[in-house]
């Protein structure tokens, strides 16, 4: 299962992403309430359909604030230029069995690689765009 970051969703909603579409068709996508929240702050069209579709996806385990702080300390995530929401996504991927994190954010991708949680479906599927 792949936890999809906001950056990937934005590209998909604007232009479409073949790799994400294939993962959705295969039932391999995880959502997270913080990603849904970030997307809800954008100008989604059609708003209700997009938000409901995201909410209907399987959800990653949501880490507590203490769990996130432990992940930050254990993996020395400070000073990498990632934000607290990013740290929550890393912790969620760590806590969700078999999950990996797909992002197009360079700093978050580096942190995901550091934790061996990075997913790059576009690189393996050959159908999507990567940056």
What are these regions (language model features)?
Residues 1-34, 40-52, 58, 118, ...:
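Short, well-structured N-terminal submotif of metal-dependent ribonuclease cores
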Residues 12, 18, 59-131:
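Active-site neighborhoods of divalent-metal-dependent phosphate/nucleic-acid chemistry enzymes
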Residues 33, 37, 87-90:
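Non-catalytic, well-ordered alpha-helical scaffold segments
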């Amino acid at each position: 299962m792949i936890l999809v970051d906001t950056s990937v969703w934005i590209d998909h909603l604007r232009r479409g992403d073949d790799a994400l579409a294939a993962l959705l068709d295969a039932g391999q996508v995880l959502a997270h309430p913080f990603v849904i929240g970030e997307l809800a702050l954008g100008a989604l069209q059609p708003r209700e359909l997009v938000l409901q579709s995201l909410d209907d996806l399987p959800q990653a385990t949501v880490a507590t604030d203490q769990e996130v702080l432990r992940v930050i300390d254990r993996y020395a995530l400070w000073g990498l230029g990632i934000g607290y929401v990013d740290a929550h996504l890393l912790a969620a991927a760590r806590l969700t069995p078999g999950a990996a994190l797909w992002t197009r954010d360079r700093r978050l991708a580096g942190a995901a690689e550091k934790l061996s949680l990075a997913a790059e479906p576009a690189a393996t599927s050959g159908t999507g765009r990567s940056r």
